[in-house]
Amino acid sequence: VYDGDTPVNERKRIRDRANIILTNPEMLNGTMLPNHSKYGFDFIFSNLKYVVLDEMHTYRGAFGSHMANVFRRLSRITEYYHAVPHFLCSSATIANPVELAEKICGQPFASVTKDGSAASERNYLLIQPPKISGKDQQYYGQESIVSVAAQILPQLMEQRESFLAFAKSRKNVEVVLKETRDRLDAADFLTTVTSDQISGYRGGYTPIERKTIEQQMIRGDLLGLVSTNALELGIDIGSIGVTVLIGYPGTRSSFWQQTGRAGRSKKSCTNYLILDHLPMDQYIGLEPGWLFDESSEHAVIDPDNLLIELAHIRAAAAELPLSLDDIARFPDLGETIPVLMKMQEVRSQNGRFAWAGGEYPAGDFSMRNIDKNKYTLLNQETGKTITEMDESQAFREIHEGAVYIHDGESYRVVKMDLESKMAYAIPFNGNYYTVAGGETNIHVIHSQKEQQWNRIRVQFGDVNVADYVYMYKKLQFHNLSLIHISEPTRPY
């Protein structure tokens, strides 16, 4: 394994000796390609026979678009070293596996679809939260899916069922985790299990935290995890007997991927779907056969997104000088080269375009999204890092006055410094958490094509998206009662 956690001396041994290297997109983008002529990477690229892309269905949207451009850069490097690798991809069920593979890898593909996985009896249960009235009516007339999940999970733990519960947001992961632990700790809840036998698992936890949680799950120290879609992937956490989906995840592909984490042995498994108040969830409640009768959705990427492609053109120029032949890989190269020359980031050299900018353009962007600005949240009392997140999420989650929950523990944000991109929080024992409110404004810059669909006009083109946060709600744990609506010290 060659990733960010691999010790320096181990990295050298892997570069010198390994025949098979397991790595991740960030390591390929930020270390291997920029240093292709150093540290023995030239030997690896010269002898590269196979490139295997696992979990291909996750490479959609901005992430998949970045990955396609990383492979464009990889093809330049392997061509430079006279290597012609074969590409192999594995994917969960999607409607367009061949199309997605060809867009990401830039090579023709053939599809192999025979299912050889273990088959077991699978049970599916839909849960419609009960209707409520009175002061809690603000939650669309039904009990929240978070509260329902916090009632179900202790019962699964009491039955010693190993489970994964999937929430649709990091916030909901933490609220479900805290409310479940609170129920387990309550004096009137008699059980043989304890609150430390359930944990969260999501982005925002450190690699060490995630690895510790994975090992605890494998050993049986934990009975279950509350996770975002981070655990849709094939991370080894032992045998799972039950999944609990806290709301429909949005696509059939995600539904099957999440429920597919249970029953990977030949034992029967149970999958719960708690229906939210949203129209899609309620439609499934009325027509559950829709989940099983229809095919999965298409996975969509846009490798030619100008912001993403430009970031990788800059990185490619620093790896090897660009030429007009590279237009076959980067369609917008002819438009971007004059801009980069004007910015003095590339210079003309013997009919090619060599990098003249900063030392490390591959480190100037995030592969997981377009937003490259990162914010850090610190525990003001200990100085330790609680989490890191991108700017758009930071404005919603760690603005001044926000209550941020990490591994079931609450922190109140007391300061946010936009210049240093740091926020500071203190431990908080209050009975509420916060949810940001705002609006998203979309301005159409250029419409490339449009079509009338019934009474709806559909356009495709370039847009400018602006998110605003101007208020936040204080919601009480366990019943979602609205305590107060506040304004941040400044709008974001």
Located regions from the model:
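Conserved interdomain linker/interface between the two RecA-like ATPase lobes of SF2 helicase motors
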Residues: 98-103, 108-169
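Post-DEXD/H (motif II) to motif III coupling segment of the RecA-like Helicase ATP-binding lobe
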Residues: 57-116
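A short beta-strand element within the Helicase C-terminal
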Residues: 233-247
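Conserved ATPase-coupling elements of RecA-like P-loop NTPase cores
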Residues: 31-36, 55-70, 176, 236-238
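Conserved SF2 helicase motif VI
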Residues: 250-271
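Conserved helix/coil segment N-terminal to the catalytic DExD/H
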Residues: 6-47
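Conserved helicase ATPase core of P-loop NTP-dependent helicases/translocases
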Residues: 10, 205-227
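Extended Lys/Arg-rich polyanion-binding regions
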Residues: 268-271, 277-295, 312-323, 333, ...
